[in-house]
Design a protein with these regions (language model features):
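Copper-binding active sites and cupredoxin-like electron-transfer domains
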Residues: 1-173
Length: 173
């Protein structure tokens, strides 16, 4: 496998440099030129299937001067899974290409797992605390109209870049 780091400029986002054969290891480095929040994912064909199996994540490139201090930070990454098993079936689930092509996921998850941000695992903050959310979407198919019930985002960095929208109720991720 290999990875496509959307924070890396150049062909394949580092895919050629990160290709690693079974039983081997690979290292590479890069200079991040642009601050922002970026997706990375497996770049080995079929890419969509590997993404749909959870081979993605977020990489944050902070500006040289750093980010303003906040009380809490959270990372949230959405993904969708398409399985041949029945909903809730335990164990390894085989990928269902037909469901993926129809964009009919069995699971839409945050941080790779059903219920990862609910109950005892929910994000907890106190009134008056400043919070920074890093929100991404690994896909491979669905988007999210992301919002927090009962609040408005002071600042939204559109698509993880440097354009800032203020006082946002819902943002597309």
């Amino acid at each position: 496998h290999n990875i496509d780091l959307h924070a890396v400029s150049g062909q394949g986002g580092g895919a050629a440099a990160t290709f690693t054969a079974p039983g081997h290891e690979t290292q590479f480095s890069f200079t991040a030129l642009n601050a922002g929040l970026y997706i990375y994912h497996c770049a080995t064909a079929p890419v969509g299937m590997h993404i749909a199996n959870g081979m993605y994540g977020l990489i944050l490139v902070e500006p040289k001067e750093g980010l303003p201090k906040v009380d809490k930070e959270f990372y949230v990454c959405q993904g969708d899974f398409y399985t041949k098993g029945t909903y809730g079936e335990a164990g390894l689930q085989q990928f269902d290409m037909d469901k993926a092509l129809k964009e009919q996921p069995d699971y839409v998850v945050f941080n790779g797992k059903v219920g990862s941000l609910t109950g005892d695992k929910s994000m907890k903050v106190k009134v008056g605390e400043t919070v920074r959310l890093f929100v991404g979407n690994g896909g491979p198919n669905l988007v999210s109209s992301f919002h927090v019930i009962g609040d408005i985002f002071d600042n939204v960095y559109v698509e993880g870049g440097s354009l800032v929208n203020h006082n946002v109720q819902t943002t597309l991720v």
